[in-house]
Amino acid sequence: MPARTPRRTTRTAVTCALLVAATTGLTACGGLTPGGSSKSAPSAGPVSTALPTGSATLTVVSSENAGTTKALAEAFHAKHPNITVDFQYTGPDDYDKSLNLKLSSDQAPDLALLNKLGTTVKGNLVRSLDDYARAYGWDAKYPSTELDQWRAPDDGKQLGAGHLWAAPAGFSVVGVYYNKDIAAKLGIQPPTTPAEFEAALAKAKAAGELPVQLGNLQGHSSFIVQSIIDAADGAAKTGDWVNGKSGATLKSPGGTAAANTLADWAKKGYLPDGANGTDLPGSVADFTKGKGLFLFNGSWDAQKIDRAMPGRTGFLTFPSESGKATGIGTSVAYAIPAKAKNPDLAAAFLDFMNTSEAARIQFDTGFLPVAHADTVKGADGSVMNEVAKGWAAVNKDNGLVNFFANTDATMNDTLTSQGQQLIGGKTGPEQYLDALQNDWTKGHQ
C-alpha cells in the first residue's frame, strides 16, 4: 500500500478498498446512496473476449488516488493503442454519495470502483461477472478467497458465495512486522509456530524490550485477535464468520485462544502502557523508533516503515500449527455497471489486472499483486520483499480472510470498545467473545 497512514482502519476504511491505504482516499465508504436503483438489470447477453479493432474509449470511475488504476490504464493503452482509458477520479465522500446515481444513469461508466456490495447488487446496478470469469478462466487464475470477497447472491446480503460482482485490482494484507535489530540482539529467529512466537515475547520482556507495539485507540487489537483466530481455525472457518454464514461463531478453539491471549499479553506487560490511548500512526511511529519487537499491521505502512528503518525490519504471517499461511486483507475492486456501453472491453481490462505486467504496477504503487506475487521484487533489503513473500504464501494456501470489522455495520465499534476493555482488565475473554458474537448475530438476522 502507499506509504500513507490509514485515517481509520474501520469497517468503512477497510471496506473501502481497504485501508488499502487509507489515504488512497478510500476511507469514507458509508452506505451508498439508495437512490437510482433500477428494478431490473438489462439482459447481459453473450460475452466476448475479443477486443475492438477500431478506436474505442473505456470509461473508469474511481476514488482510488494512489495512482494504481491510472498506471494500469496507461499500460493497457500502451498495449492496445486504439483503446483510450478515460480515468475519472472523484474524492471518496462525493464518490460514495453519487455512485448509485452514476451507475443507474444512461451515461453509466464502463467500470466503477466498488467499496462494498449491497445496494449496488440488490438494485441491479452492476452485472454479474460469472460469464466473464468463465471466459477468461479467472477461477484458475485467482485463489478462491480473493474472488469470494466479491461474491454474493442477488440480494447482496451474505458474502462469499453466489455471483461474482467485481474483480480485484490490488490487495493489502495484515501480518506481523518485527525489528531485526532487537531480534538479532536477543537471538530470536522469525517464529514459525505459535509456541515460538510466545517464547519470543517472553524473551523480549525478560530483556527489557517491549514485546508487542500496539495502538488501540481505534480498535487495532482486532488485528492481533483475528490473526490468531485465522491461524488457529483456518481461513475457511473464519471467512464464513466474516461473510455472515448461518451458524458461524467465534466461540471456537481459535476464538477462545485469541481472547485469552490478548488478555494474557496485557497482564504480562507485553503491550505498551497507554495502548488504548494511542492510534495506529502513533504505534507505527513508536515501532520505527525501536519501541517493540513486533507490530501487527498492514502492508499499507510497509514503505513508511522501510524509510524509517531501512533494511532493519522483517515481516511474517502469524504462524499456525498447521503450517498454512493466513492473512487479513481485502482489495480495491471494480465492477461493470449493468448499463455499461462496453462491457466486453471492461472485462478485458479487468483481466489485464491479473497479468505479470499489472503485478509490477500494483506492487510499485503500493498494492500487493492480484496474481504473480512471486515475480515482484523491491529494493534489496526492503521489507516489501518479505511482505510480498508472505502474500504469495497466503495466496498459495488460499488463506486470505476479510477484516472482522467488515462483517456488519457495528462490528468495528464493538471490536474497539471490547478490545479496550479486555486490555484494560474491565472485561474477560469470554465476555469479549460474547459481545462480538452478539453483535454478529444482530447484524446477520
Where are these regions (language model features)?
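Conserved N-terminal structural module of periplasmic/extracytoplasmic solute-binding proteins
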Residues: 2-123, 299, 322, 361, ...
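Extracytoplasmic/periplasmic substrate-binding proteins
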Residues: 77, 224, 260-345
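Hinge/lid segment of periplasmic solute-binding proteins
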Residues: 117-173, 314
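Short, solvent-exposed loop/beta-turn-alpha elements that line the ligand-binding surface or hinge
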Residues: 130-146, 216, 234-257, 307-308, ...
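Extracytoplasmic/periplasmic solute-binding protein
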Residues: 160-169, 174, 198-248, 292
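Glycine-centered hinge/linker elements that transmit conformational signals in sensory
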Residues: 201-203, 244-275
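C-terminal capping/gating helix-and-loop segments adjacent to ligand/active sites or protein-protein/ligand interfaces
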Residues: 244, 368-371, 388-441
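Mature extracytoplasmic/periplasmic domains
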Residues: 300-303, 332-409
